[in-house]
Swiss-Prot record:
Stated family: Belongs to the MurB family.
Protein's UniProt name: UDP-N-acetylenolpyruvoylglucosamine reductase
Entry function: Cell wall formation.
Top enzyme category: oxidoreductase
GO biological process: cell division; cell wall organization; peptidoglycan biosynthetic process; regulation of cell shape
UniProt-listed Pfam families: FAD_binding_4 (PF01565), MurB_C (PF02873)
Organism superkingdom: Bacteria
Residue runs in coiled coils: none
Source organism per UniProt: Bacteroides thetaiotaomicron (strain ATCC 29148 / DSM 2079 / JCM 5827 / CCUG 10774 / NCTC 10582 / VPI-5482 / E50)
């Protein structure tokens, strides 16, 4: 048995029957050819978007494919090919250092580049799908395929790579197109307010502001186990919002292009009185109600029980189902 304690940011002490890393497409293909994936398997990135509910009875695979390669460049933009095992925030830092615009609002999001393309990570008005041009993969038969971005089925925190039928499709590289021309996204959260503290706006300053905002709201997984936002913000028809506004006139919301609205799940959880509350060794964070934390010694089942209780409260008060953004393993 192999401990996965260092491979999940929730800090859940669970075990896998076997654990295997690979550092290249060739190594992955060799594992496949040797029959290593004939038993149950799970492919993970940085473990920052997982909750292990129990030990994993099978093989856990982890990519260590590295590298950031410029494949095309002109005066206006740059195309880069990035290994799935590159730490996401290291890639963001690299982009900012080189003056490439696009990733900066996604600073400090935990995890790795491969998982960013699977999950369609997003923050502060930016989603990674808007930067991706293609995703390179290998399937369980050892066959390589490149998915153009419009083949990836991207939606809010979703892609075709999350579907059960694509469980055996492994992301190996992600290709991005980034701008070399000044292009900022500032109208989200408290970004503009925080920028007033600085005499000018630059990429490094915006990255610092994003990091400061995140650190002020979100606990450090190295200190208190968590997986960032545990729940997705629900998207509802405008009619549902208007009905809720009768009872909750101050309910916050964000307009979407298709006429629907997104309601902050954290606000609803807070309205249900859960912020800062614990259920055994698991708790709702006292600064950001979207975040569930391991106060120490929690099992995955403890966090899941808290999640279920929070969801039931929101459903009872608002008539809305909120769903985990975190992937539940072993439920």
């Amino acid at each position: 048995m192999y401990s996965l304690l260092s491979h999940n940011t929730f800090g859940i002490d669970v075990y896998a029957e076997r654990f295997q890393e690979y550092a290249s497409v060739e190594e992955l293909k060799t594992l496949i050819a040797q029959g290593a994936l004939t038993t149950p398997f799970l492919h993970i990135g940085g473990g920052s978007n997982l909750l292990f509910v129990k030990d994993y009875e099978g093989l856990v695979l982890h990519s260590r494919i590295e590298g950031i390669e410029v494949t095309e460049e002109d005066e206006r933009s740059v195309a880069v090919r990035v290994g799935a095992g590159v730490v996401w925030d290291d890639f963001v830092g690299y982009c900012v250092e080189h003056g490439w615009y696009g990733t900066e609002n996604l600073s400090l999001i935990p995890g790795e580049v491969g998982a960013s393309a699977v999950q369609n990570i997003g923050a502060y008005g930016v989603e990674v799908k808007d930067l991706i041009t293609s995703v390179e993969t290998v399937n369980i038969h050892g066959e390589e395929r490149v998915y153009a971005v419009d083949e990836c089925g991207y939606a809010y925190r979703d892609s075709i790579f999350k579907r059960p039928e694509n469980k055996s499709v492994f992301v190996t590289y992600v290709c991005f197109r980034l701008s070399k021309e000044e292009r900022y996204t500032l109208d989200y959260g408290t970004i503009r307010q925080e920028l007033e503290k600085y005499p000018e706006l630059t990429l490094p300053i915006l990255r610092k502001v994003i990091i400061d905002i995140r650190e002020s709201k979100l606990p450090d997984p190295k200190v208190m186990g968590n997986a960032g936002s545990f729940f997705m913000n629900p998207i509802v028809p405008r009619e549902k919002l208007e009905a809720l506004q009768q009872e909750f006139p101050r309910i916050p919301f964000y307009e979407l292009n298709d006429g629907r609205v997104k309601i902050p799940a954290g606000w609803m959880i807070d309205q249900c009185g859960w912020k800062g509350k614990a259920l055994g060794p698991a708790a709702v964070h006292d600064k950001q109600a979207l975040v569930l934390v391991n106060r120490g010694g929690a099992k995955g089942s403890d966090v899941l029980a808290l999640s279920d209780a929070v969801r039931a409260s929101v459903r009872a008060k608002f008539g809305i189902d909120i769903h985990p953004e975190v992937n539940l393993v072993g439920k």
